[in-house]
Amino acid sequence: MTKCNYEQLLDPEIFRLAYELKKSKSGNMKPGADKETLDGFSQAYVEKVVRQLKDESFQFRPSRREFIPKADGKLRSLGIPSPRDKIVQEVMRRILEPVFEPRFLDSSHGFRPHRSPHTALRQIRRWTGTSWMIEGDIKGYFDNIDHHLLAGFIAELVKDQRLLALYWKLVRAGYVNQGKAEPHLLTGVPQGRILSPLLSNIYLHQFDLFMEEIKVKYTTTGALSKNNPIYLKARNKYYKLVKSLKASSAEIIRARRDMLKMTYGIQTGSRVRYVRYADDWVIGVTGPKALAVQIKEEVSTFLQEKLKLSLQAEKTRITNLSRSEALFLGTLISITTRKYVQSQKVGGGHRRASLGRIRLCIPIDILIGKLSQMGACDEKGTPKAVTKWIFLNVGEIINKYMAVFRGYYNYYSFADDIHHLLQIIYILRYSAINTVARKLGLNTAKVIKRFGVDLIFRDHTNEIKHKLNFPRSLPNKRMNFALSPPSDPRVLFDTSCARIQC
């Protein structure tokens, strides 16, 4: 097992690596509450910080508190550390992550190496037979993490008291809000700190372990169902009529209809599955609704008693996947319900289509809503010009529209209904035409006549300089999950979990 100790913090090389990583991100060059930037970060500066860490005189500075609007109209609190503190936090992350990462479970996907929303959704894709889905929503998760509990979880693997003391210095650094100092109340992991994703995963790792116990407790061994004798009887009747020379077409159709009304299996067992991405999680249940209700109650009790967290009652839903859809990581989840008999024979008999296969679909109404907020269309999806882009040059305008499309296309590459992105292409195409028309002082008909619906702009040699390069078709690739992390759904649109990394 990888171990960590305070002495690792005193290596100037790890500070250099942390600095190189942080300076590559423009947002990290912004000053914190102390107005300091990374521009003056030098070898002498590193040596000074290392000396302070060595004699334990180092103190974190208060983070600058900012508030950004959430989708529900409320404000989300961010804590922006000074660039110096970002570097120290990055060094701490590099020391702590190798210790905790091997302990995290396969059910956890948020803010982890080689994991992404796609790895979480790929796991759910395999949940064939799931009847119910519990959509989890923890009330104010990041604001309600108990630091005494979190320190205890860290101390299970980190035995160096100086590292734990440095953690408490970070916690107690507090904030500066509009020039006024605010003490830390010892609850909440501020979003915006480098360590926030790792700390939040350490905290909810306890929930992951609890869910492993729930899975073992409620997942039965053996087959989950047995053949329904009533269905078998109806099926045999249907095939006899098909083979009979005396049966009328009406009799055959009626027998087939009666057969397809029935389920071919009777549920005899249960199965529980679970996936988490940051503070967003879902539980898949194969079994009766009563089992899903029982699990939800046990989850609520565990979170309250062991982690001092509460479920958001109105947002924690139990969804019947055969009748409705659950929303997780910007994706609608349901199961196939179509019943039909395939003509091919398997083992001397006819094979029936598999029911309960997971469908992952695009929440097209949400996407249109985001395009409406962007100004590309109205609430009904009718395209219009994005007036704030009129002052860009034509190439920049086209690049803006293509970037929006690529974000959605790369994220939803796995969707069962990826053809719905053709509606997004339509909106973006004609919004772009309207925007270019406004810029050039032309009507849309003249823009289309001059440049085509792809807005093809050529240079003086007649080479294509700019073009809307939308695909003409969108083939369905259900298992087309990205190996590298795609855009986080928080960037595409505001889901229920908050952006926590700076």
From Swiss-Prot:
Signal peptide: none
PROSITE patterns named in the record: RT_POL (PS50878)
Lineage: superkingdom: Eukaryota
Keywords: Mitochondrion
One annotated GO biological process: mRNA processing
GO cellular component: mitochondrion
Domain Reverse transcriptase: 49-333
Location within or outside the cell: Mitochondrion
Pfam families (UniProt xref): Intron_maturas2 (PF01348), RVT_1 (PF00078)
Protein name per its UniProtKB record: Uncharacterized mitochondrial protein ymf40
Organism of this sequence: Marchantia polymorpha
Organism placement in taxonomy: Eukaryota, Viridiplantae, Streptophyta, Embryophyta, Marchantiophyta
